[in-house]
Amino acid sequence: LQGGSAAHISYVSIVGALETATNRCLKSKSIAGDMLLKSTTKTMVLRVPMVLGEGDYASYALRRNALKSLNFLFRPSSMDQPLYAGDVVRAIKAGAVKELEGAYDLVGPEPLSRRDLIKRTASMLGRRTKVVGLPIALGLILSGLLEKLFSNPPVTRSMLEVLDHDDNMDTSHTEELLKISPLVSLDAMLEKILNTHERP
């Protein structure tokens, strides 16, 4: 980036993408962020959890699962803390205006299990769904087999490990620093994304 014209860079990473991460995906994200932070261009690394926005794949997948009468998930007790895509955009804009430097976590206002997230989404759609948990070890075995069978498998062990996480953080300091409080509530977020039915 030396000699470039950019005055500020905002790099969106993943919660847990730290130097100490053992997961390959998180580790590579951490390395990329560190490279930008060490460059001559002012950089803000923003680590976010599951992001939900109108018309995106994560929101489509959540709605699809909520409409099912039965869901099978690997460790549905894992904690999510969804963040609205519009709040990510606001954070990026605020960071650029302030030319903020450094790495920051920003998560949504409400932590809940993946099971509860699907059930709440189903309830907002006027539906009921049952979520059956599967052992994560089974998923790791299956994804390992897929890695051996396909050059570009649909899911890898590293991807599954990223999904098997627990987000339950207080990032109000980041909100205050960027002056983007309050964040969009989970219910308001779900209302926004459920009004968009198109497949991304």
Protein language model regions, located:
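Mid/C-terminal beta-alpha module of Rossmann-like enzyme folds, strongest
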Residues: 91, 95-155, 169-200
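Flexible, glycine-rich beta-alpha linker
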Residues: 21-24, 44-63, 112
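Short histidine/acidic/glycine/proline-rich micro-motifs that form metal-
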Residues: 16-19, 50-53, 78-79, 108
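Low-complexity, charge- and small-residue-enriched intrinsically disordered regions
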Residues: 70-85, 146-170
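Short, surface-exposed alpha-helical segments at coil->helix boundaries
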Residues: 26, 30-33, 56-60, 115, ...
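Short, hinge-like loop/turn segments at secondary-structure boundaries
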Residues: 27-29, 61-65, 123, 148-151
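A conserved pocket-lining segment of Rossmann-fold NAD(P)-dependent short-chain dehydrogenase/reductase
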Residues: 64-83, 87, 91-99, 105
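Conserved Rossmann-fold NAD(P)-dependent oxidoreductase catalytic core, especially the SDR/UDP-sugar
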Residues: 1-33, 37-39, 43-49
